[in-house]
Structure formats: structure tokens, C-alpha cells
């Protein structure tokens, strides 16, 4: 099994292996196999389109968790310039599961804040697997308040399996930190654009998810709980995660139908990890378009629309 591909992608992986083998043979034996390679590549693209046209909710969850999927820092490096990371919550610690700092989007200053996971074992431990402790949320709020002081828009990138549930986090009042962010973000007199780039789970996602616009990548998910957590509660078995994923309605298409997100950003064929540069360029265009729209509004209009938007959830 090719570990760069998920279980439902293995037919694609097998065909790609044949393409790679043909290329090796052509190069080593100086044979022109371009026509054969092109035919197989077209066949592989068709197979990929076929598989990805009918994904289940649980398969989308798998894509959102793909180990090669772009993380916040990958997008910061490709979308923004002059990024200057800011550290610490001024209460307890640095909190590396959330990163943030000043940057420029097409020359305009912005405050970028997002969850950051790790790829290697050491990075995963350092970033706490993208699960923020209270100090992470307090750092994020500190940066948002700083942005408000200088009338700088905030852009958040959401990618977390949830807020960290450890004893220390609870002792430092995890629930208060999340609630405080919801309360304060609702009142910030600056544009806020939130984008779910991977996992958007529970209060850990909401703590940097209150904004004027909510964007979502095509194969990200946004939910009150993970499918496995939901299945463990309702069916006492994580094996029912597939059923839970369908019931939760956590996909971009479903959330857009419900009016909980504003835009779905299409991903490259096979997912964002198949062409990170193209995905970043597309996300950049959506961010810029929404930012231009929001910056044309007064602070009072922003707040009024934000209040109406969030108070409308769950009414219909």
C-alpha cells in the first residue's frame, strides 16, 4: 500500500506506480514512451475524477487529515509576505499549537492567526498535534486586540481536531478561554475572515472562528465533534464513525446548504496536498476578494452584520 494515498485512493496509486515505472524504463533504456505515459495519465485523471465525484463524508474527513495536507505555515509562506511571528499570551506561555503574526496580503497589512500541526514526531509533540491549550487561545486574542488597535484586518486559518482536553488545560480554564474569544471576536471593529483549511473541530475551531466571512476548503470538515468521538458517545464504538460523519453534516457542501459557511474553495484534483501552490493561489484570491469587500464597510456596519449573521444560526 502506498501511504501517500488513502485506502479509497489505492486504485489511483496503483495506476500512478505504472506511470512512474514506464517513465523509469523510458529514461534508463532511452525509449520514447511519451504517448503511452500520456494515455495512462489521462486514464489516471479520469479515475481520480470518478472516485472524487462520489466521496462519503468519512472519506472527506480522511482527506482533511491527510498527513501531506498543507498546514497554516505552508499557506503563510505562499500567500503572505513579510510575516513576523508574534509570541506568547502574556499570562502563561508561548503555546505553539497556534501561530500568529503580522504579514502583508498583496502589500496590505493583515494579522494572520492559525492552528499549526506537525509532520515529524518532534513537530507533532511541539505543536501538540494542533490542539491548543488556553494560552494558545489567549495569545490569539491578544493578537486580534493588537490588530484592532491599529485597524488591521484579521485572517484566521482553522485546522484542529479540537481544543486540548488535558488536566493542565482545564486547570487554566480552557472553557473560559474559548468563551472569551467568542465574546471578544464578536465585537472587534475590524474585518475578520475565517477559513477552515483542514479539520474544524469543536470549540478549538470556534475559538478563532467568529468572523464576517467563513470560507472552507472543499475537502475540509467543520463539526461540533469528531466522527469518532460522536460514534463513541452514541454507539459506544468508534467503528460507527462513517455513520456519525454522515449524521453530523460536516462537509463543505452540507454546511453551505445550511448557510453556516459563505464560500467553498475548490481544491486541486485529488486534494490540496496534490498541488499546494495552486491551492494557495486560489485561497489567496478568495481572501483578497472578501477582504476588499469587507474593508469598504464601516466598523458599525461590520458589527451589525456580524451580530445578525451569528444570531441567525439555528433559527430556521
UniProtKB/Swiss-Prot annotation:
Gene Ontology molecular function, alphabetical: acetyl-CoA carboxylase activity; ATP binding; carboxyl- or carbamoyltransferase activity
EC number: 2.1.3.15
Keyword terms: ATP-binding, Cytoplasm, Fatty acid biosynthesis, Fatty acid metabolism, Lipid biosynthesis, Lipid metabolism, Nucleotide-binding, Transferase
Record-linked InterPro entries: Acetyl_CoA_COase_a_su, ClpP/crotonase-like_dom_sf, COA_CT_C
Gene Ontology cellular-component annotations: acetyl-CoA carboxylase complex
GO biological process: one example: malonyl-CoA biosynthetic process
Residue ranges of domain CoA carboxyltransferase C-terminal in the record: 39-293
Keyword Transport attached: no
Broad class of enzyme this protein falls into: transferase
Main location: cytoplasm
Annotated pathway: Lipid metabolism; malonyl-CoA biosynthesis; malonyl-CoA from acetyl-CoA: step 1/1
Subcellular location: Cytoplasm
Catalytic activity: N(6)-carboxybiotinyl-L-lysyl-[protein] + acetyl-CoA = N(6)-biotinyl-L-lysyl-[protein] + malonyl-CoA
A Pfam family reported for this protein in Swiss-Prot or TrEMBL: ACCA
Purpose of the protein: Component of the acetyl coenzyme A carboxylase (ACC) complex. First, biotin carboxylase catalyzes the carboxylation of biotin on its carrier protein (BCCP) and then the CO(2) group is transferred by the carboxyltransferase to acetyl-CoA to form malonyl-CoA.
PANTHER family: ACETYL-COENZYME A CARBOXYLASE CARBOXYL TRANSFERASE SUBUNIT ALPHA, ACETYL-COENZYME A CARBOXYLASE CARBOXYL TRANSFERASE SUBUNIT ALPHA, CHLOROPLASTIC
Subunit relationships: Acetyl-CoA carboxylase is a heterohexamer composed of biotin carboxyl carrier protein (AccB), biotin carboxylase (AccC) and two subunits each of ACCase subunit alpha (AccA) and ACCase subunit beta (AccD).
Entry similarity comment: Belongs to the AccA family.
NCBIfam families linked: accA, AccA_sub, PRK05724.1
The protein's name in its UniProt record: Acetyl-coenzyme A carboxylase carboxyl transferase subunit alpha
Designated gene of the protein: accA
Amino acid at each position: 500500500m502506498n501511504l501517500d494515498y488513502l485506502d479509497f485512493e489505492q486504485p489511483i496509486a496503483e495506476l500512478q506506480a505504472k506511470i512512474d515505472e514506464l517513465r523509469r524504463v523510458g529514461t534508463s533504456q532511452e525509449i520514447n514512451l511519451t504517448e503511452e505515459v500520456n494515455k495512462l495519465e489521462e486514464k489516471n485523471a479520469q479515475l481520480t475524477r470518478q472516485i472524487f465525484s462520489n466521496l462519503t463524508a468519512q472519506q472527506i474527513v480522511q482527506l482533511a487529515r491527510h498527513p501531506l495536507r498543507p498546514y497554516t505555515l505552508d499557506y503563510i509562506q505562499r500567500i503572505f509576505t513579510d510575516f513576523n511571528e508574534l509570541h506568547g499570551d502574556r499570562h502563561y506561555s508561548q503555546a505553539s499549537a497556534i501561530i500568529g503574526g503580522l504579514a502583508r496580503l498583496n502589500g496590505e497589512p493583515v494579522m494572520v492567526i492559525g492552528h499549526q500541526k506537525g509532520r515529524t514526531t518532534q513537530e507533532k509533540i511541539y505543536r501538540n498535534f494542533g490542539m491548543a491549550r488556553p494560552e494558545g487561545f489567549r495569545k490569539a486574542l491578544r493578537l486580534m486586540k493588537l490588530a484592532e488597535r491599529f485597524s488591521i484586518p484579521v485572517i484566521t486559518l482553522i485546522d484542529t481536531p479540537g481544543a486540548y482536553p488535558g488536566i493542565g488545560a482545564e486547570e487554566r480554564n480552557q472553557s473560559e478561554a474559548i468563551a472569551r474569544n467568542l465574546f471578544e471576536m464578536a465585537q472587534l471593529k475590524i474585518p475578520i475572515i475565517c477559513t477552515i483549511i483542514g479539520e474544524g473541530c469543536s470549540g478549538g475551531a470556534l475559538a478563532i472562528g467568529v468572523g464576517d466571512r467563513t470560507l472552507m476548503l472543499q475537502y475540509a470538515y467543520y463539526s461540533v465533534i469528531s466522527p469518532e468521538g460522536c460514534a463513541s458517545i452514541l454507539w459506544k464504538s468508534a467503528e460507527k464513525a462513517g455513520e456519525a460523519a454522515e449524521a453530523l453534516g460536516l462537509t463543505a457542501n452540507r454546511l453551505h446548504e445550511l448557510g453556516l459557511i459563505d464560500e467553498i474553495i475548490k481544491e486541486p484534483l485529488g486534494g490540496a496536498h496534490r498541488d499546494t501552490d495552486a491551492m494557495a493561489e486560489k485561497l489567496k484570491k478568495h481572501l483578497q476578494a472578501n477582504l476588499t469587500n469587507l474593508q469598504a464597510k464601516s466598523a458599525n456596519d461590520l458589527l451589525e452584520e456580524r451580530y445578525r449573521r451569528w444570531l441567525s444560526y439555528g433559527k430556521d
